[in-house]
From Swiss-Prot:
This is Chaperone protein HscA. GO terms for molecular function: ATP binding; ATP hydrolysis activity; ATP-dependent protein folding chaperone; unfolded protein binding. One of its GO terms (biological process) is iron-sulfur cluster assembly. SUPFAM superfamilies: Actin-like ATPase domain, Heat shock protein 70kD (HSP70), C-terminal subdomain, Heat shock protein 70kD (HSP70), peptide-binding domain. Gene3D superfamilies: 1.20.1270.10, 3.30.420.40, Actin, Chain A, domain 4 (3.90.640.10), Substrate Binding Domain Of DNAk, Chain A, domain 1 (2.60.34.10). Pfam families: HSP70. It comes from Xenorhabdus nematophila (strain ATCC 19061 / DSM 3370 / CCUG 14189 / LMG 1036 / NCIMB 9965 / AN6). The gene is hscA. Keywords: ATP-binding, Chaperone, Nucleotide-binding. Chaperone involved in the maturation of iron-sulfur cluster-containing proteins. Has a low intrinsic ATPase activity which is markedly stimulated by HscB. Involved in the maturation of IscU. Belongs to the heat shock protein 70 family. The keyword Iron-sulfur does not apply. The lineage of its organism: Bacteria, Pseudomonadati, Pseudomonadota, Gammaproteobacteria, Enterobacterales. HAMAP family: HscA (MF_00679).
Length: 615
């Protein structure tokens, strides 16, 4: 399926004019930029032939340092040197301080509770820090290509939520970059590996970077690239390996001081030791007045529990995809942390096959992003690649009784648009509150609230008379827009969902587990709630009818209806949906004659004063 060559606003669609595009891997620990030149994809190096750019920014009064220079100052100036900023993207200050209590920065909260870091250069937020990293990479690309970039594809973890993705886009715009698309990191890696070889089948992409872990189960078939399921953890990566090793060194050396500068030095030594242990069976450690040695087996014991956590995510993703480990043809290893021998061994044992590591795991994501950028900017209009990503949790609306009506089920491929029609519950209702939720449970209270907005100006008709069409639209970057349209008047209201802080992979996993654990109970709870809503509707409708036409009933009929009403009210107080349903049917039976008389009376009133010819 070929992509249509439609020029972006401001870009020429002239044939033979090659446009400059780049793929950027905006990583937690390191970032890279890659391009396609003369048909070959390559990552770009700096003047000292270093391809990786540390995702570190130092803010000084006189200037800003990005990358290697900033990293060198991290130990001596930790307060003004921001690293692993990706972990802060889209999160509230309270969430960050709870997750990472030992960060050395001087934080203060913005008006909406987001983090601001007080530096020598003033207050900066995660978007500004990310923007400075992107700016540095863009300058490297433009210098190498000798021209201005027409567009970039930036990669993000598969489990980044709307706020985190929007923050990444905002950082790119702040850096003066035109974002062609945000691309999931595992998806980018699969482009670099799977599509080039043309292999069809199921592939697992295991991406363990510095700060995040993602696993994607993909299917490649006849040029169609589909993500079957995703999983992972936005707060687990090689940085955690370093932290465990740094704590081990601290214990062995008998260090009790919690000085931030000392902690940074310990982390630097731990990182270097981890790298040595990827090649050697043991490593010598020198810190202050202490000297020691750690073996690879000792290091493995420290990190085994973390690696097992990643494999649990793999197991869940396989289950979501409806495939077994035996059906996986290849396992793609992504991220610098996959160089750790224990990681490769445990992943190989889990999938029962040797993982693919032929492309540098640090560069493979940037390479895939560059390939995609080259296509999206219009340099490969004949490309047969079709890319489909998925949403991690179902999206829906709250309906009467606190129930959830799912509009887009989880693991639906994106971009996607789905619509459903709803109606009013009460007579004369002129407004409707739209509550957007995310999750797999049947009740709103058990799901995550995303946004609320109100559609006003609905014609005040009888209950059920107005028809409101609610449309959910998720774009290629995973951002959700919800609109509500009253069909008779054309009145519309909409909202773009941008949560103020992120949803961790652990929370997603918990929500999925809870939905499975409580599935039977949820069905019963939903059935009970639905019957209670129906009972309320019936009672409200009957109350209105009696207020207008009670004179149509005999005393005996009134007593019988009152008894049926009381029985229904009592059943609603209970927990049996069947009892409520039975009481509704009994009330309906008692009021059938009343309804027929009301209909006859309405017809007579309508015909009064009119001749047969007029009718």
């Amino acid at each position: 399926m070929a992509l249509l060559q439609i020029s972006e606003p401001g870009l020429s669609a002239a044939p033979h004019q090659r446009r400059l595009a780049a793929g950027i891997d905006l990583g937690t620990t390191h970032s890279l930029v890659a391009v396609v030149r003369s048909g070959q994809t390559e990552t770009l190096a700096d003047s000292e032939n270093r391809h990786l750019l540390p995702s570190v920014v130092q803010y000084r009064k006189e200037d800003i340092q990005v990358g290697w220079q900033a990293r060198q100052q991290a130990a001596s100036d930790p307060v003004n040197t921001v690293s692993s900023v990706k972990r802060m993207m889209g999160r509230s200050l309270a969430d960050i301080q709870k997750r990472y209590p030992n960060l050395p920065y001087q934080f203060q909260a913005s008006e909406n509770g987001l983090p601001l870091i007080n530096t020598a250069a003033g207050l900066v937020d995660p978007i500004q820090v990310s923007s400075d990293i992107l700016k540095s990479l863009a300058q490297r690309a433009e210098k190498t290509l000798d021209g201005k970039l027409d567009g970039v594809v930036i990669t993000v973890p598969a489990y980044f939520d709307d706020a985190q993705r929007q923050g990444t886009k905002d950082a790119a715009r702040l850096a003066g970059l035109h974002v062609l698309r945000l691309l999931n990191e595992p998806t980018a890696a699969a482009i670099a590996y799977g599509l080039d070889s043309g292999q069809e089948g199921v592939i697992a992409v295991y991406d363990l970077g510095g700060g995040t872990f993602d696993v994607s189960i993909l299917r490649l078939s006849r040029g169609v690239f589909e993500v079957l399921a995703t999983g992972g953890d936005t707060a687990l990566g090689g940085d955690d390996f370093d932290l465990l090793l740094a704590n081990w060194i601290r214990e062995q050396a008998g260090i009790s001081d919690n000085d931030h500068r000392l902690q940074r030095q310990l982390l630097d030594i731990a990182t270097q030791t981890k790298i040595v242990l990827s090649e050697a069976d043991s490593a010598e450690i020198c810190f202050a007045d202490w000297q020691g040695r750690i073996t690879r087996n000792e290091f493995n014991e420290l990190i085994t529990s973390l690696v097992k956590r990643t494999l649990l995510s793999c197991r869940r993703a396989l289950k979501d995809a409806g495939v077994t480990a035996d059906e996986v043809l290849q396992v793609v290893m992504v991220g610098g942390s996959t160089r750790v021998p224990l990681v490769r061994n445990m992943v190989g044992e889990f999938f029962d096959r040797e993982p693919l590591t032929s492309i540098d795991p640090d560069r493979v994501v940037a390479i895939g992003a560059a390939i995609q950028a080259d296509i999206l900017v219009g340099n490969k209009p004949d490309s047969e690649m079709l890319l489909l990503d998925v949403i991690p949790l179902s999206l829906g609306l709250e309906t009467m009784g606190g129930l959830v009506e799912k509009v887009i089920p989880r693991n639906t491929t994106i971009p996607v648009a789905r619509a459903q029609e709803f109606t009013t519950f009460k007579d004369g209702q002129s407004a409707m509150s739209i509550h957007v939720v995310q999750g797999e449970r049947e009740l709103v209270n058990d799901c995550r609230s995303l946004a609320r907005f109100t559609l006003r100006g609905i014609p005040p008709l009888a209950a059920g008379g107005a028809h409101i069409r609610v449309t959910f639209q998720v774009d290629a970057d995973g951002l959700l827009s919800v609109s509500a349209l009253e069909k008779s008047t054309g009145i519309e209201s909409s909202i773009q969902v941008k949560p103020s802080y992120g949803l961790s992979d652990e929370e997603i996993a918990r929500m999925l587990k809870d939905s499975m654990t409580n599935a039977q109970e949820d069905i019963q709870v939903r059935k009970l709630a639905e019957q209670k809503v129906e009972a309320a509707r019936v009672l409200e409708s009957l109350t209105g009818a009696l207020e207008k036409d009670a004179d149509l009933l005999s005393q005996e009929e009134q007593v019988a209806i009152d008894a049926a009403v009381q029985a229904l009210i009592e059943s609603v107080q209970g927990t049996s949906p069947d009892a409520i349903e039975s009481a509704i049917k009994q009330l309906d039976k008692q009021t059938q004659e009343f309804a027929a008389r009301r209909m006859d009376t309405s017809i007579r009133r309508a015909l009064a004063g009119h001749s047969v010819d007029e009718i």
